[in-house]
């Protein structure tokens, strides 16, 4: 389906309503994948080539104890990580940035504007529809984070950590209402594929 070498990508369950959709997209793309509790020790992730940090319930990214070992994964991973919604917000907080209640909480369809295609948005339109479901948003980016996309109500919809294959998305690419969602996952898997040969 994706033309990638065999790879293992686990989805870290942070209690999000669409965690199974993330797993299902990866399965559809012929990736060896499973959902794991966010309490899984990093040392038990033997042979994993990448992680997807799922979304979670409202404000969960601010409640560190409910995010399990996500911080450990970020500190120790030498492979790509994609944080979605609460996963993205946790990444921001973990590296010294900040999240805050959104000026305009986003639920449903919104228009995404790609500012920098980087690797994640290669080959995609500069503007397309995505699905949102968040009360909080990234308010302060840590040093070394690069904004990749925004919407009219949210100035940071996607980022990359410079020098690392770590990405964050505020919107939900796994939801069918997001245009090009599968393509975003495919582009992430291309990053994983290229990282595997290093």
Where are these regions (language model features)?
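Short, Lys/Arg-enriched N-terminal segments with co-localized hydrophobic residues
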Residues: 1-6
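Flexible gly/pro-rich beta->alpha loop and the following alpha-helix that scaffold active-site loops
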Residues: 8-10, 16-84, 95
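Active-site flanking residues adjacent to catalytic metal/cofactor-binding acidic residues
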Residues: 12-13, 171
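Pocket-forming structural segment of enzyme catalytic cores
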Residues: 68-84, 89-183, 187-191
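Generic C-terminal helix-cap and adjacent flexible tail
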Residues: 190-198
């Amino acid at each position: 389906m994706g033309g990638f070498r065999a790879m293992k990508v686990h989805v870290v369950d942070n209690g999000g309503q669409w965690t199974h959709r993330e797993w299902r997209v990866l399965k559809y793309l012929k990736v060896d994948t499973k959902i794991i509790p966010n309490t899984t020790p990093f040392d038990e992730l033997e042979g994993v080539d990448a992680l997807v940090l799922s979304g979670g319930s409202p404000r969960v990214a601010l409640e560190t104890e409910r995010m399990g070992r996500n911080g450990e994964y970020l500190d120790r991973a030498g492979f790509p990580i994609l944080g979605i919604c609460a996963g993205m917000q946790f990444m921001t907080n973990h590296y010294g940035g900040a999240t805050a209640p959104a000026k305009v909480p986003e639920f449903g369809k919104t228009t995404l504007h790609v500012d920098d295609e980087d690797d994640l948005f290669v080959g995609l339109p500069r503007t397309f529809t995505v699905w949102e479901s968040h009360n909080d948003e990234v308010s302060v980016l840590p040093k070394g984070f690069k904004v990749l996309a925004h919407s009219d109500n949210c100035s940071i919809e996607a980022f990359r950590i410079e020098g690392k294959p770590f990405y964050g998305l505020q919107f939900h690419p796994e939801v069918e209402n997001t245009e090009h969602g599968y393509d975003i996952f495919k582009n992430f898997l291309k990053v994983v594929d290229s990282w595997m040969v290093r």
